């Protein structure tokens, strides 16, 4: 069982996934820093508050922390946009695979045409 596990881990897909998860976690930290240290203060200039995470409105004793939600939406949009750009860039760099023509048998029309040709040849004899 240990041998199977080693083979599983040694496969390229698992290693690629592990690297992707680690890079993704590091990238998330960078995006959160970008949002909280650069984007939120920029937005805060127009709203009059620098820290968006403290934006709250209350109805009775219920407090709706929409500022924290805005931070998460901004984080998501930035990450989604960067992933989009990365995929687009990778697709440009990667060689396009030529679609291999799969040879199948003749279509029904071709079979019928072949039979018609044979019948016509027999009639001419």
From Swiss-Prot:
GO terms for cellular component: plasma membrane. The keyword Flavoprotein does not apply. The gene is mscL. InterPro entries: Mechanosensitive_channel_CS, MS_channel, MSC/AndL, MscL_channel. One of its GO terms (molecular function) is mechanosensitive monoatomic ion channel activity. Belongs to the MscL family. Keywords: Cell membrane, Ion channel, Ion transport, Membrane, Transmembrane, Transmembrane helix, Transport. This is Large-conductance mechanosensitive channel. It is found in: Cell membrane. It is a multi-pass membrane protein.
């Amino acid at each position: 069982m240990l041998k199977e596990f080693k083979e599983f881990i040694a496969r390229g897909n698992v290693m690629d996934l592990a690297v992707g998860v680690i890079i993704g976690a590091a990238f998330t930290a960078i995006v959160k820093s970008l949002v909280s240290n650069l984007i939120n203060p920029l937005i805060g200039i127009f709203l009059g508050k620098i820290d968006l995470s403290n934006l709250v409105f209350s109805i009775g004793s219920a407090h709706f922390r929409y500022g924290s939600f805005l931070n998460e939406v901004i984080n998501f949009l930035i990450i989604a946009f960067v992933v989009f750009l990365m995929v687009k860039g990778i697709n440009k760099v990667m060689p396009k695979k030529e679609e291999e023509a799969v040879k199948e048998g003749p279509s029904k029309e071709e079979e019928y045409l072949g039979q018609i040709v044979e019948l016509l040849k027999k009639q001419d004899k």
